[in-house]
């Protein structure tokens, strides 16, 4: 399995698209959390879109990061949107019932924003 990698793209619509790859676990959660924290206070960002399509694995550290990111972004007047990941990743959200409380889309739109 691969360590967490991520690439952030800012769109003209005010979305920050973070494309994730590899494993979202304790070792990779810190740098991603710092990036989300930075985006929560950046002017012009209205939504943070986490693209989970290339994520291979996610543990409870990843779930915690997503839950805290949603809270932090909401407090800053921003929205968190998740692009659905592979079945194994989505299953973690289903089992914990977090899927009922988060915004998921199937893919980002053409500008990189959430559809």
Regions inferred by a protein language model and the residue ranges of each:
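STAS-like cytosolic regulatory interaction modules
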Residues: 1-56, 68-115
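Conserved G/P- and acidic residue-centered "switch" motifs that form tight phosphate/ATP-binding loops
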Residues: 59
């Amino acid at each position: 399995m691969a360590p967490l990698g991520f690439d952030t793209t800012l769109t003209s619509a005010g979305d920050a698209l973070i494309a994730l790859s590899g494993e979202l676990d304790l070792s990779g959660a810190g740098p991603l959390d710092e990036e989300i924290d930075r985006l929560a206070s950046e002017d012009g960002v209205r939504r943070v879109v986490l693209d989970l399509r290339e994520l291979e694995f996610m543990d409870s550290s990843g779930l915690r990061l997503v839950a805290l990111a949603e809270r932090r972004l909401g407090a800053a007047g921003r929205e968190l949107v998740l692009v659905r990941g592979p079945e194994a990743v989505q299953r973690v959200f289903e089992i914990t019932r977090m899927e009922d409380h988060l915004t998921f889309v199937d893919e980002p739109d053409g500008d990189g924003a959430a559809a």
